[in-house]
Amino acid sequence: SLFRGKAEMDCGYYMLVSGSRMSGGNVLADIEFFTIEEGRTTDVNLVMRDAADQLRVIGSFDSEMKYLSVPADEISPLSPVISSESQRVEKSVLETTGRGYFAVALVDYGTEPTNHAFMDISAVASELEQWGRTILVVFASEEDYRKFRAQDFNLPSTVRYGIDTDGKMRNMIASEMKLDKGGRLPLILVADTFNRVVFFSQGYSIGLGESLVRTSKSL
């Protein structure tokens, strides 16, 4: 990045403009003026403004991304997953969630980070249901999906399920959020259908469920 080190510039009077795009579409801007003199080094701070009562746009997520949607009757809180592959449909995230905000959790099966994430989300299920937006749980593979047992958790009723059969969703998230090697599952984000990401987490962090609730209440 140009701002990480020194840069040679012509002598003169300069204006440095920076901006932080917020979830509401507004931009918090900062303007700094400085002079470059011959033979002298000028240090200028790059200021990225923030607001505690607003969410920043921190990345992008393509809401037209396709995944394999799993019919509701495949997952029951009282029984293991039952395959009915002929009823599965490739859909976009937008088709599933409708316009507005949504959450996506790209997960594997049986790992400690994913299990902890599911337990955290289960603990705040009622509050996430009050938010009323779709939470799309996408399994990283068919194998991960087949092993999942919904009855092991108390996930919100607003959860929908799917499979990232070709890994394209994971690759897209990793590219947009600048993650190495596909990131650490689970990858959890809150975004809108204008493709703006306002919350992101990879792996497991303590208080994940509460963080999702706080984010939902700020939208």
Regions found by a protein language model. Name each.
Residues I75-F102, G110, M119-A123:
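A short beta-strand-turn-helix
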Residues L2-M15, S20-M22:
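Short Pro-Gly-centered beta-turn/loop motif in secreted/extracellular proteins
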Residues V47-S69, R184-L219:
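Thiol-/selenol-based redox modules, centered on thioredoxin-like
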Residues L2-E8, D43-L46, I163:
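Exposed aromatic-hydrophobic patches
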Residues F102, L106, G110-S157, K168-I173:
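Structural microenvironment flanking redox-active thiols in thiol-disulfide oxidoreductases
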Residues E38-T41, L68-I75:
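Solvent-exposed, conformationally flexible loop/turn segments
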